């Protein structure tokens, strides 16, 4: 009898369905995650540190879908239905009935640890916790929660609505049913998942960010200008955008955080962040979001800054 009950409980967990998703962070990644979840028919609660930020996130989602309607990529009925499914949540207590809570805050380990420490007590026992981190150890983040076995990395690519890939990363304690539930969730969103082990920056950013960092070194050492480097990689390597333009799009602070995680986590000098990247971040030149990075966006059309 005890065996039958255990099997039933395990099967119940394996078929755990995600119907309601909490998203912590209403910025670029968070609002993108909220958008794709709502379009997939899921109810979404979006949380951030202020109502103004949550309202801005809602406006961004609405604007993005309105543009898709204008292009014929989305029906007005689907846009309205998705917007009706996204609500704001002022406090972590409001996320208590979510089946999955996705953290999409800034790429700062201390910030994420504080979020998970505060969040865990308010969630129902069956709820999964996921992080959208692009570089931080899943095992370390899971350790501050009350459910490391129900914790997983679900790393979306930017921009979330357009990019097909999602990385799934298990921590050392992540159970099989958590992984299978996360995999089914990603499939419901119409995206493709790939599995990475819990190493710094996982797969995509371990390959991508050193390339961007090397492009910044190429600029720093005077090998080529911003325009020359980006043109070379667009036309010579068939990249859709140059590495410096891509760095601005990602955010130079995020690029630096990932390179620091690689450098510290793997202890290899080849991952040392370029001093020019450090200087730009110190200056507050973070790319498109601050309207200045390797390009100046303040006058409209991007102008190379070096």
What are these regions (language model features)?
Residues 50, 75, 175, 224-228:
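Helix N-cap / loop-to-helix initiation motif
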Residues 8-11, 21, 35, 80-100, ...:
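Amphipathic alpha-helical segments at domain termini/boundaries
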Residues 45, 87, 102, 152-154, ...:
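Hydrophobic/aromatic beta-strand patches that form the interior of the parallel beta-sheet core
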Residues 2-67, 71, 122:
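NAD(P)+-binding Rossmann beta1-loop-alpha1 motif at the extreme N-terminus of oxidoreductases
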Residues 52-63, 177-188, 231, 235:
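A non-catalytic, amphipathic alpha-helix used as a structural packing/dimerization or gating element
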Residues 128-197, 202-206:
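Rossmann-fold dinucleotide-binding core
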Residues 2-15, 180, 187-198, 217-221, ...:
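NAD(P)-dependent Rossmann-like dehydrogenase/reductase catalytic/cofactor-binding core
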Residues 52-53, 67-128, 136:
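Rossmann-like NAD(P)-binding element
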């Amino acid at each position: 009898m005890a065996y039958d009950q255990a099997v039933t409980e395990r099967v119940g967990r394996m078929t755990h369905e995600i119907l309601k998703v909490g998203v912590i962070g209403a910025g670029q990644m968070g609002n993108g995650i909220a958008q794709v979840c709502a379009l997939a028919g899921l109810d979404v609660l979006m949380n951030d540190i202020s109502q103004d930020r949550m309202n801005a996130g809602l406006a961004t989602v609405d604007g993005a879908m309105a543009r898709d309607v204008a292009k014929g990529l989305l029906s007005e009925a689907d846009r309205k239905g998705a917007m009706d499914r996204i609500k704001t949540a002022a406090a972590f207590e409001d996320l208590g009935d979510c089946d999955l809570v996705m953290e999409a805050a800034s790429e700062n380990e201390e910030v994420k640890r504080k979020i998970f420490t505060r969040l865990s007590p308010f969630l129902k026992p069956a709820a999964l916790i996921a992080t959208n981190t692009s570089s931080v150890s899943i095992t370390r983040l899971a350790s501050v929660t009350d459910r490391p076995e129900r914790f997983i990395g679900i790393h979306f690519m930017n921009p979330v609505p357009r990019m097909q890939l999602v990385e799934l990363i298990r921590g050392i304690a992540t159970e099989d049913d958590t992984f299978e539930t996360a995999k089914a969730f990603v499939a419901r969103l119409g995206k493709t998942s790939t599995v990475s082990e819990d190493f710094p920056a996982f797969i995509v950013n371990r390959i991508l960010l050193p390339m961007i960092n090397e492009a910044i070194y190429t600029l720093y050492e005077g090998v080529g200008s911003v325009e020359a480097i980006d043109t070379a990689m667009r036309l010579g390597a068939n990249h859709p955008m140059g590495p410096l333009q891509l760095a601005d799009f990602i955010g130079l602070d995020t690029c630096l955080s990932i390179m620091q995680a690689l450098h510290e986590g793997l202890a290899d000098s080849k991952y040392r962040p370029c001093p020019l990247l450090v200087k730009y971040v110190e200056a507050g030149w973070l790319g498109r979001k601050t309207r200045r990075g390797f390009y100046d966006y303040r006058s409209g059309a991007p102008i190379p800054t070096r």
